[in-house]
């Protein structure tokens, strides 16, 4: 593809996102759809825009994103992580600001597995004394 393109991979829960950044007018395309069409919820859109707003690049970069797996919140988090990594590849001086905001660290929280003998991960069956 283009020479002046920067790449970042982001993950969150069971979602993974591939983010390509290049200088442009501020278009954000996710799985061949616009940000507004892909994410119906405003909170998810805010999460995606967070790293760009932090470094004042909202209207200066075009983003092409493919994301797979998980739900809305996980995908939004994965995209945010991917954008952060791509921005660091684009300009290493942004790393400290992004680190302070907490976008660089991968959120390792995921669903706890269901255990044998329990109803859910921690929910026990009802106990009857008599």
UniProtKB/Swiss-Prot annotation:
The keyword Cell wall biogenesis/degradation does not apply. GO terms for biological process: translation. GO terms for molecular function: RNA binding; structural constituent of ribosome. Pfam families: Ribosomal_S9 (PF00380). GO terms for cellular component: cytosolic small ribosomal subunit. Residues 116-130 have a biased composition (Basic residues). Residues 110-130 are annotated as: Disordered. InterPro entries: Ribosomal_Su5_D2-typ_SF (IPR020568), Ribosomal_uS9 (IPR000754), Ribosomal_uS9_bac/plastid (IPR023035), Ribosomal_uS9_CS (IPR020574), Ribsml_uS5_D2-typ_fold_subgr (IPR014721). Keywords: Ribonucleoprotein, Ribosomal protein. It comes from the Bacteria. Signal peptide: none annotated. Belongs to the universal ribosomal protein uS9 family. NCBIfam families: PRK00132.1 (NF001099). PANTHER family: RIBOSOMAL PROTEIN S9, SMALL RIBOSOMAL SUBUNIT PROTEIN US9M. This is Small ribosomal subunit protein uS9. It comes from Proteus mirabilis (strain HI4320). The gene is rpsI.
